[in-house]
Curated annotation (Swiss-Prot):
Pfam families reported in the protein's UniProt record: DUF150_C, RimP_N
Gene Ontology annotations of biological process type: ribosomal small subunit assembly; translation
Protein name per the record: Ribosome maturation factor RimP
Taxonomy, superkingdom: Bacteria
Species for this entry: Laribacter hongkongensis (strain HLHK9)
Amino acid sequence: MDVRTLLETTLSGLGYELVDFELGHGGLMRVFIDAPAGIALDDCVKVSNHLTRLFTVENIDYDRLEVSSPGLDRPLTREADYARFAGERVRIKTRLPIGERKKFAGTLVGLADGQVELDIDGERVAIPLASIDKARLDPQF
């Protein structure tokens, strides 16, 4: 079982969602989690303790483990995220230019037929999901 599948299965069983994970320099593993009610410090501690034991049993090689929430500007990594966060401001970067631009910011309308739809200053823009390199929430204060 690969690390992503192991994390997704384990976190789901604990009531959390794997947003993303990174394997960094020096054996650092960062795990970003979320839950419908949000994430508190106690959640991070609980998941960290559980994953530490799990990684020992599964012989996963890492030196340091960091568990945290994805933050206010969380990445959108799954198709379900585009429905969950409809109505929110987002920033999207595409792999290749679409209409001479690669960066888009607007209100997320949703996902339909493989197209992410944004409202950018009253204009609807459709971006193929497969073309998206990065997508993040863009909270406005």
